[in-house]
């Protein structure tokens, strides 16, 4: 019965997302909330200038409303779901402010890096203080084994790193039409299966609400995109997936299931270090998806390849997290 409930959860979130998007996109156009395209980006992206952004609000509303209603309906509105809603709201709010400054105040960089970091830190600290001992404990598990290591207060540092790093890594992935929507749906789908295996049904409901919401958004975000999610969506999704991994005690497994996000982030780190130390670039452009674009791949080919990689990594993660 619960399995059907999870499918219903995804279905409801999908329908809300699909229903809201056609109403919200013209509203964004009317407000002239269009995406600015950086001059240093791929030239093929210049035609996307003016495409409505902040569409992440649709994802945000769809998954928050659905997960809350379904968690109440199935009596799983506990500490875990409450924490996930807190993180999603907090990081989504930071993303919203960042987008708002970019498109309304016409300040291309949005929030300063310090402002964004302070906001991310506040949410991460609140998550740790509220959840410690109630929704999660301060040890990590080796994936596929019963081996655990108690970290004590060092776990606090890990939580900060995961939430801040996770939100930024997912944000970096949001650079091509449909790329993040698809990879996020795959990753949250994998974690929902692990959550069911652990009988963490509240977390599973939340994950399936995200899956439905991003797939509904993908209908309008696939190439050629009619709307972008902006930081409103990407930061919320990044914070949420890191929080899910923490609550399921699959902190290390996030590196595999979120492997696409990790690769995107590493490409940026490698590029910066290489250029600062040698004056040479390893990639034609970072994050990694832009490198393949400049190698002559079509945008759709890059997106499908990254989706495929995300799917294979998700299957590996499920195998380790459930069957091993």
UniProtKB/Swiss-Prot annotation:
One of its GO terms (molecular function) is UDP-N-acetylmuramoyl-L-alanyl-D-glutamyl-meso-2,6-diaminopimelyl-D-alanyl-D-alanine:undecaprenyl-phosphate transferase activity. PROSITE patterns: MRAY_2. Pathway: Cell wall biogenesis; peptidoglycan biosynthesis. One of its GO terms (biological process) is cell division. Its EC number is 2.7.8.13. The chain crosses the membrane at residues 5-25, 52-72, 77-97, 122-142, 149-169, 176-196, 201-221, 227-247, 253-273, 302-322. It comes from the Bacteria. Pfam families: Glycos_transf_4, MraY_sig1. InterPro entries: Glycosyl_transferase_4, PNAcMuramoyl-5peptid_Trfase, PNAcMuramoyl-5peptid_Trfase_CS. Its cofactor is Mg(2+). It catalyses: UDP-N-acetyl-alpha-D-muramoyl-L-alanyl-gamma-D-glutamyl-meso-2,6-diaminopimeloyl-D-alanyl-D-alanine + di-trans,octa-cis-undecaprenyl phosphate = di-trans,octa-cis-undecaprenyl diphospho-N-acetyl-alpha-D-muramoyl-L-alanyl-D-glutamyl-meso-2,6-diaminopimeloyl-D-alanyl-D-alanine + UMP. Disulfide bonds: none annotated. It is an enzyme of class 2 (transferase). Its main location: membrane. CDD domains: GT_MraY. It is found in: Cell membrane. GO terms for cellular component: plasma membrane. Keywords: Cell cycle, Cell division, Cell membrane, Cell shape, Cell wall biogenesis/degradation, Magnesium, Membrane, Metal-binding, Peptidoglycan synthesis, Transferase, Transmembrane, Transmembrane helix. It is a multi-pass membrane protein. Catalyzes the initial step of the lipid cycle reactions in the biosynthesis of the cell wall peptidoglycan: transfers peptidoglycan precursor phospho-MurNAc-pentapeptide from UDP-MurNAc-pentapeptide onto the lipid carrier undecaprenyl phosphate, yielding undecaprenyl-pyrophosphoryl-MurNAc-pentapeptide, known as lipid I. PANTHER family: PHOSPHO-N-ACETYLMURAMOYL-PENTAPEPTIDE-TRANSFERASE (PTHR22926), PHOSPHO-N-ACETYLMURAMOYL-PENTAPEPTIDE-TRANSFERASE HOMOLOG (PTHR22926:SF5). HAMAP family: MraY. Belongs to the glycosyltransferase 4 family. MraY subfamily. This is Phospho-N-acetylmuramoyl-pentapeptide-transferase. It comes from Bacillus cereus (strain ATCC 14579 / DSM 31 / CCUG 7414 / JCM 2152 / NBRC 15305 / NCIMB 9373 / NCTC 2599 / NRRL B-3711). The gene is mraY.
């Amino acid at each position: 019965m619960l399995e059907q409930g999870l499918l219903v959860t995804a279905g409801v979130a999908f329908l809300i997302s699909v229903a809201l998007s056609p109403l919200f996109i013209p509203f964004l156009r009317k407000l002239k909330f269009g995406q600015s395209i950086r001059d240093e980006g791929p030239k093929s992206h210049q035609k996307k200038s003016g495409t409505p952004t902040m569409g992440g609000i649709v994802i945000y509303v769809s998954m928050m409303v659905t997960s809350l209603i379904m968690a109440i309906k199935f009596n799983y509105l506990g500490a875990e779901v409450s924490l996930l809603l807190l993180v999603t709201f907090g990081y989504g709010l930071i993303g919203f402010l960042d987008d708002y400054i970019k498109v309304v105040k016409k300040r291309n960089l949005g929030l300063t890096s310090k402002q964004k970091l302070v906001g991310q830190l506040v949410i991460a600290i609140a998550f740790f203080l509220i959840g410690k001992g109630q929704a999660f404990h301060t040890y990590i598990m080796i994936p596929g084994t019963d081996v655990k290591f108690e970290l004590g207060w060092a776990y606090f540092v890990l939580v900060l790193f995961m939430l801040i790093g996770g939100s930024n890594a997912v944000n970096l992935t949001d650079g091509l039409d449909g790329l993040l929507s698809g990879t996020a749906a795959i990753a949250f789908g994998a974690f929902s299966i692990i959550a069911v295996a652990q009988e963490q049904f509240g977390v599973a409901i939340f994950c399936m609400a995200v899956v439905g919401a991003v797939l509904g958004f993908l209908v309008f975000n696939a190439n050629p995109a009619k709307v972008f999610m902006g930081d409103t969506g990407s930061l919320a999704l990044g914070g949420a997936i890191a929080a899910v991994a923490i609550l399921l005690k699959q902190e290390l497994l996030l590196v595999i299931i979120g492997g696409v996000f990790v690769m995107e982030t590493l490409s940026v780190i490698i590029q910066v270090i290489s250029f600062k130390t040698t004056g040479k670039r390893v990639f034609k452009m970072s994050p990694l998806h832009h490198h393949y674009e400049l190698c002559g791949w079509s945008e759709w080919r890059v997106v499908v390849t990254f989706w495929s990689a995300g799917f294979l990594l998700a299957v590996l993660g499920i195998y380790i997290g459930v069957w091993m």
